């Protein structure tokens, strides 16, 4: 379960999230909608660890992740597919997948890794066909698929899109 308690955050000196409380149960899908500047991206970036909240907490399965660096939050089980295209132009699709793959570690018994580079390219066959291509050579849609694949390879419990 993802739990946000009293989350307050903002950007450019302004606050857009004011004491937000939210619980997201396992196996559910939620959407956040609102006008420009309402705080949708700030919310996602705060949960993913890209922005530190000014107050409140983010917990994943009861474990505090507030204020941790994004790579630790990803390891804790929160994956992010960025809004814009986020691929490294000089890396091939294969290199992106290897870079993002996180095999299970000892103690990860509760997180079996069902997402492997082979499994991802099986589910997203267009990526499999382009494994040798550089990020700069991919179409916008292919870059977005690659961003999704990279997020899945962390075997996240929560996936932020």
Specify the residue positions occupied by each region the protein language model found.
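ABC-type ATPase nucleotide-binding domains, specifically the catalytic core motifs of the NBD
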Residues: 12, 68, 93-115, 125
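ABC ATPase NBD coupling module
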Residues: 52, 64-85, 109-113, 117, ...
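Conserved ABC ATPase signature
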Residues: 134-138, 142
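ABC ATPase C-loop
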Residues: 151-152
